[in-house]
From Swiss-Prot:
This is Serine--tRNA ligase. SUPFAM superfamilies: Class II aaRS and biotin synthetases, tRNA-binding arm. Its EC number is 6.1.1.11. ATP binds at R281, R282, E283, V297, E368, I369, V370, S371. Pathway: Aminoacyl-tRNA biosynthesis; selenocysteinyl-tRNA(Sec) biosynthesis; L-seryl-tRNA(Sec) from L-serine and tRNA(Sec): step 1/1. InterPro entries: aa-tRNA-synt_IIb, aa-tRNA-synth_II, aa-tRNA-synth_II/BPL/LPL, Ser-tRNA-ligase_type_1, Ser-tRNA-synth_1_N, SerRS_1_N_sf, SerRS_core, tRNA-bd_arm.
Length: 441
């Protein structure tokens, strides 16, 4: 949620911000219309309360003098009825105004590219050595900014679906039979590889000061509304029937809500938390996309970075969580690029977002594996998370980033580390797996 006082004094700034994000500026008009109505009713309400206080004092003085005050008491009763009516009206206006306020997006950072479409995200850097099928060379050079390190290969790598089924480590048919599309069984060494990825990421983040948690996998509506953009996530979230609960789409939402309605001490900040959880997504808006395999699925495991910090430090911490994620993928040997996400693709909460996109040689394209965002005080306002500082209380800033979404990284490893019909395990994971290759079962 944005700062109401800031909005009231910077209407044009927020209108321009909506324009940059592709959001209808009419929501700003709606807010100011409701806000003026709220102010008008509030003035009347305060006037009635003041009149009641004046009348109450006058009645008390009259009673001291032995005067009859029945008429005055009748007037006070009428004022009370008016106050009750105005209080009800102002609550209704507040609810409608707040509903509009929730839809107004966060102010974007000055470094965000002003444009629309993922294809217009700004390439920040490319890292790694890629294998590029000859027909995909132009796509790779364009996606890496023209200077990516790569080698041309004459045969396209097998898809993770074909390779996984040949090696006996992925079973999609059985999962579809019992659960439907976008579910999977992963088996034996591929499962051990997934567990190795999780343990490696947990160790990596623990060594960098993160407290590792497994959060609740369900959140109530109040927490979910405060932590995320329900309008954006309406096609993503699973609602528990007859319960005020939703399955989480990411542990970010549980971790952010963990400190809702709390005051922190300045000395406690920053608070670094790594969430380890299953994630559940309906993917209702992804009809026809990645219908086969384990790249885009309804259930997957993810390690998430989250930081609560002081406002003046948040931009440094955005670079920190991005650097953490990059170090993980450099150590795995997965080629990737970092992009500065453009204004039209940020979502409502983020003031700035970086994506890390790995090169997938079987698909011949870069694809997102990490999103790292600074939500500034927007999420903290929605969840009412403040800290005490000299001179008054202030909202914290919140930041989040994927460390590893396991199914996507399994796909990246299967495509980038194919060797003679088997899968080579990245060196840093061998101590966790206990084996160097995945061969046919």
């Amino acid at each position: 949620m944005i700062d109401v006082k800031l909005l009231r004094s910077n209407r044009e700034l927020f209108e321009k911000n909506c324009e940059y994000r592709g959001v209808d500026k009419a929501i700003i008009d709606q807010f100011f219309k409701l806000d003026e109505e709220w102010r008008s009713v509030n003035r009347e309400l305060n006037g009635q309360r003041a009149e009641k206080n004046r009348m109450t004092r006058a009645i008390a003085e009259s009673l001291k003098r032995g005067k009859i005050v029945s008429n005055e008491k009748d007037r006070v009763e009428l004022i009370n009825e008016k106050i009750v009516s105005l209080e009800k009206k102002i609550r209704e206006i507040e609810e409608e105004r707040d509903r509009v306020l929730w839809t107004i997006p966060n102010l974007i950072h000055e470094s965000v590219p002003i444009c629309f479409g993922d294809e217009n995200n700004k390439i920040v850097r490319y890292v790694g050595h890629a294998k590029v099928y000859r027909d995909d060379e132009e796509e790779f050079l364009k996606g890496s900014g023209g200077n990516g390190d790569y080698e041309v290969i004459d045969e396209r790598p097998k898809s993770h679906v074909d390779l996984g089924q040949e090696l006996g480590i992925i079973d999609l048919e059985s999962a579809a039979k019992i659960s439907g599309a976008r579910f999977y069984f992963i088996k034996n060494r591929l499962l051990k590889l997934e567990m190795a990825l999780e343990n490696y990421a947990v160790d990596f983040l623990s060594q960098r000061g993160f407290t590792v948690v497994e959060p609740p996998y369900m959140l109530n509506l109040e927490s979910m509304r405060g932590a995320t953009d329900l309008e954006t996530f309406k096609d993503t979230l699973y609602k528990i029937e007859d319960e005020d609960l939703y399955l989480i789409a990411t542990s970010e939402h549980s971790i952010a809500s963990m400190l809702s309605n709390e005051f922190l001490e300045e000395k406690e900040l920053p608070i670094r938390v790594a969430g380890v959880s299953a994630c559940f997504r309906r993917e209702a808006g992804a009809h026809g996309k990645d219908t086969k395999g384990i790249f885009r699925v309804h259930q997957f495991n993810k390690i998430e970075q989250f930081i609560f910090c002081k406002p003046e430090d948040s931009w440094d911490y955005l670079e920190e969580i991005l650097s953490n994620a990059e170090e993980i993928y450099r150590s795995l040997g997965i080629p990737y690029r970092v992009v500065n996400v453009c204004s039209g693709e940020l979502g409502r909460l983020a003031a700035k977002k970086y994506d890390i996109e790995a090169w997938f040689p079987a698909q011949g394209k870069f694809r997102e594996i990490v999103s790292a965002s600074n939500d500034t005080d927007y999420q903290a306002r929605s969840l009412n998370i403040k800290y005490r500082k000299s001179g008054g209380n202030e909202f914290v800033h919140t930041l989040n980033s994927t460390a590893i979404a396991t199914t996507r990284i399994l796909v990246a490893i299967m495509e980038n580390f194919q060797e003679d019909g088997r899968i080579r395990i990245p060196d840093v994971l061998v101590p966790y797996t206990g084996f160097q290759y995945i061969d046919k079962e």
